[in-house]
Curated annotation (Swiss-Prot):
The keyword Secreted does not apply. FAD binds at residues 14-19. The gene is trmFO. Belongs to the MnmG family. TrmFO subfamily. Pfam families: GIDA. It comes from Bdellovibrio bacteriovorus (strain ATCC 15356 / DSM 50701 / NCIMB 9529 / HD100). GO terms for cellular component: cytosol. This is Methylenetetrahydrofolate--tRNA-(uracil-5-)-methyltransferase TrmFO.
């Protein structure tokens, strides 16, 4: 396949975040892309629309902070002209220091981008076997891969998939929020006051925890164990770890002074704007597997949400992922088939934007391979390079678990820096310097 030209068709399976990004990047390079998306014919347990790059869990890409690891990942993606990032800013809604989006506007933008690109052919069909698609190919089918294709992949790799469960938080009608109790503010008054905050005193919190414990839960079917990713942990699982866990997690009150009392309450439930019109808010960090009726009953105990109208209730679904350090090469191609690439959450990254970045990287790696260029990965010191290392380092294979971007993935400084803030600033400076020099 060394004589492949720019006219060679590339198959991308899955029009989620990673697949859409990868397809657009390859198409921009002049390649003809055939993009498969099954949701016109077969829906997943979590998706609600047929649009591309649908956001099924949170509506946030995480921090934009200049000295945060997620912020650095976005800085690098912007330098590489990420289509997903551009669309996110076009669909941006107020979310403090995070990049929040109107999920419908965002998906509509991405769908139009993909459908209108002259080098992309869309096929609304279900791919059931790796043998059905020509190479080169990119599999970006996500954690909710069709069962038949998942079985084909299992046979290809010769071992079982790994899996974990994650959960989706409810969305509330803004008009049903009691603004005499809930107030708008960002933590420590940073930002423009984009979050509604629902306060609880100690007695209210304790009763709330008791009702979460009593509530009927939806248990996953057909599995003996239930592993949850830490970043999408259901609140009832957190409560099982101890009654105060929520107070030090999604309900931490520090930096949120209740205007009625002048000090921060015992606990706080935060609501983040979910659409551009500001008519819908999601419950931050409130992923849940409680039964629907129980969610309504328990969440209406929250001060400010006594009469809450739920536009969407929380749910749970299973996520599949490959043991990438064991089964994938550094360029995210299969060790069993060098022209079969993988991108997105199925590679073991966790998070919308991390998934996007793997799609962006695969587009560069595939381009290098098609042009017979040496493999040129992003520098190890960069956020992109650190994320890639986390999912391809063979030493991680035995205990591999999904990861999102964080400072622990970046290499330590050559000279130890005791000050945590300065240490992070120096790591960011190094990452930016090496990315400025990288020419993929």
């Amino acid at each position: 396949m060394t004589n492949i030209t720019q006219n060679q068709k590339i198959t991308v399976v899955g029009a989620g975040l990673a697949g859409s990004e990868c397809a657009l990047q390859l198409a921009d390079m002049g390649y003809s892309v055939v993009l498969y998306e099954m949701r016109d014919k077969t829906m997943t347990p979590a998706h609600k629309t047929h649009k591309f790059a649908e956001l099924v869990c949170s509506n946030s890409f995480g921090s934009l902070g200049e000295h945060s690891a997620p912020g650095q990942l976005k800085w690098e993606a912007k330098k590489l002209n990420s289509h997903i990032l551009q669309a996110a800013f076009e669909a941006q809604v107020p979310a403090g220091q995070a990049l929040g989006m109107d999920r419908e506007v965002f998906s509509a933008i991405m769908t139009e981008k993909v459908k209108n690109h002259p080098n992309i052919e869309i096929r609304n069909d279900v791919v059931k076997s790796l043998n059905d698609i020509p190479r080169p190919a990119v599999i970006a089918t996500g954690p909710l891969t069709h069962d038949d294709l998942a079985e084909s992949m299992r046979q290809h790799f010769g071992d079982e998939f790994l899996y974990f469960f994650d959960a989706i938080a409810p969305i509330i009608d803004a008009d049903s929020i009691n603004t005499e109790i809930a107030w708008k503010a960002d933590r420590y008054d940073k930002g423009t006051g984009d979050y509604y905050n629902c306060p609880m005193n100690k007695e209210e919190y304790n009763r709330f925890i008791e009702e979460i414990q009593k509530a009927r839960k939806i248990e996953p079917k057909d599995f003996e164990t239930t592993d949850f990713f830490e970043g999408c942990m259901p609140i009832e699982v957190m409560v099982d770890r101890g009654p105060q866990t929520l107070r030090f997690g999604p309900m931490k009150p520090i930096g949120l002074d209740d205007p009625r009392t002048g000090r921060y309450p015992w606990a706080v439930v935060q609501l983040r704007q979910d659409n551009k019109e500001g008519t819908a808010y999601n419950m931050v960090g409130f992923q849940t597997r409680m039964a629907y009726g129980e969610q309504v009953r328990v969440f209406r105990m929250i001060p400010g949400l006594e009469n809450a109208e739920f536009l969407k209730l929380g749910s749970i679904h299973r996520n599949l992922f490959i043991n990438s350090p064991k089964r994938l090469n550094k360029d995210l191609s299969s060790k069993n088939d060098p022209w079969l690439f993988f991108a997105g959450q199925i590679t073991g990254v966790e998070g919308y934007f991390e998934s996007t970045c793997t799609g962006l990287m695969v587009s560069r790696f595939l381009n290098q391979k098609l042009k017979d260029q040496p493999f040129n990965p992003p520098p190890r010191e960069s956020a992109f390079g650190s994320l890639l290392e986390a999912i391809t380092d063979p030493t991680r294979a035995e205990h591999f678990q999904p990861t999102n971007i964080n400072f622990a993935l970046l290499p330590p400084l050559a000279e130890k820096e005791r000050d945590k803030t300065l240490r992070k600033e120096k790591q960011i400076a190094i990452a930016r310097n090496v990315m400025e020099q990288w020419n993929p």
